[in-house]
Amino acid sequence: MGKIILFEDVEFGGKKLELETSVSDLNVHGFNDIVSSIIVESGTWFVFDDEGFSGPSYKLTPGKYPNPGSWGGNDDELSSVKQQ
């Protein structure tokens, strides 16, 4: 099982959301279109700009992603996450 932590602000600041399962709509957790940094503690994850695991996606492996540029995305656009 993997774990990903999403943060509202760059450099791991603001509100955070810890997940261990895929989420097709981050709005359920109040995290739609606000993610600005990510820590992947374990597993491989795909993050998507649109809900329902659609739109542009980015593959993330364990590590720290302090800003959207570090995963190749744009600020405040993520809407779903899927564990591989």
Swiss-Prot record:
Monomer. Coiled coil: none annotated. Keywords: Repeat. PANTHER family: BETA/GAMMA CRYSTALLIN (PTHR11818), VOLTAGE-GATED HYDROGEN CHANNEL 1 (PTHR11818:SF42). Structural component of the neuroectodermal visual system. Pfam families: Crystall. Belongs to the beta/gamma-crystallin family. This is Beta/gamma-crystallin. Residues 64-84 are annotated as: Disordered. Has a single-domain beta-structure, folded into two very similar Greek key motifs. Residues 2-42, 43-84 form the Beta/gamma crystallin 'Greek key' domain. Palps of larvae and otolith of the light-sensing ocellus. SUPFAM superfamilies: gamma-Crystallin-like. SMART domains: XTALbg (SM00247). It comes from the Eukaryota.
